Regions:
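Short, aromatic/basic amphipathic alpha-helical patches
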Residues: 164-171
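Short, flexible coil/linker elements and helix-boundary hinge sites characteristic
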Residues: 16-17, 169, 204
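Short, flexible loop segments at boundaries between secondary-structure elements
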Residues: 172-206
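General "foldedness" signal
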Residues: 73-76, 124-126, 167, 188-196
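Short beta-strand scaffold positions
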Residues: 155-156
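A polyanion-binding, active-site-adjacent surface
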Residues: 2-151, 160-162
Length: 206
């Protein structure tokens, strides 16, 4: 992150911490790649000061919408879990595929958000798209708050990619990349290894 990184982090946390997060996770147990997805003190910069060195404000990962109600969840919970969370195992496993796919890549530490915010719905076909102007106003404000400059935007799935392609101007990003959604189980993406291979190919990473 640029400029005053700590100040910028706190602004993002206070303004969008309920709906966004960062592509940083704890390491899983060796025998279970879906473990250790909870945030605990991960985003507490007093207890984890090394966190700020990992964060990137010019890479943005974008999902579609929340799949569940998120009232009273801790800051930066999105794409993670937390102690006491009764998240569905499949949902947690799918999110852990993101961690596995991006670990050790230049995209680790990216900012993560959803286009449709505050609309929990597990079935994407039921998501309300009647307020897209406001959704994209908020998204642009996120980018401005991040001080993102011509960011690389990674869209999880074709629905998100199409929305971004249709509503953003080409000069608002340097690259817009569609990657397979982490809930996708075909084309070898059912496993963590298969999903990583697919995503790295789509990102043109050897």
């Amino acid at each position: 992150m640029q400029n005053d990184i700590k100040k910028n982090f706190e602004i993002i946390k206070n303004k969008y911490g309920d709906v966004a997060s960062w592509a940083v996770w704890k390491s899983p147990d060796n025998d279970n790649l879906a473990t250790n997805m909870d945030i605990d003190d991960l985003f507490d910069i007093e207890r984890n000061p090394e966190l700020l060195k990992q964060l990137q404000n010019n890479i943005i990962m974008v999902g579609y919408n929340f799949s569940r109600q998120t009232d009273d969840f801790p800051k930066f919970h999105n794409f993670h879990s937390f102690k006491g969370d009764n998240v569905n195992h499949t949902t947690l496993r799918n999110a852990s595929k993101i961690r596995y796919a991006f670990k050790g890549t230049p995209y680790w530490g990216a900012y993560m958000t959803d286009i449709i915010k505050n609309h929990p719905e597990s079935k994407s076909k039921n998501v309300d798209l009647s307020n897209l102007d406001e959704d994209f106003r908020i998204f642009r404000d996120e980018l401005e708050t991040l001080q993102a400059d011509n960011p690389v935007i990674i869209a999880f799935g074709s629905k998100v990619y199409t929305l971004l392609k249709n509503h953003l101007k080409p000069q608002e990003y340097s690259r817009l990349i569609r990657v397979t959604h982490y809930a996708h189980y075909n084309d070898g993406c059912a496993t963590h290894e298969g999903y990583r291979s697919k995503v790295l190919n789509q990102l043109s990473i050897d």
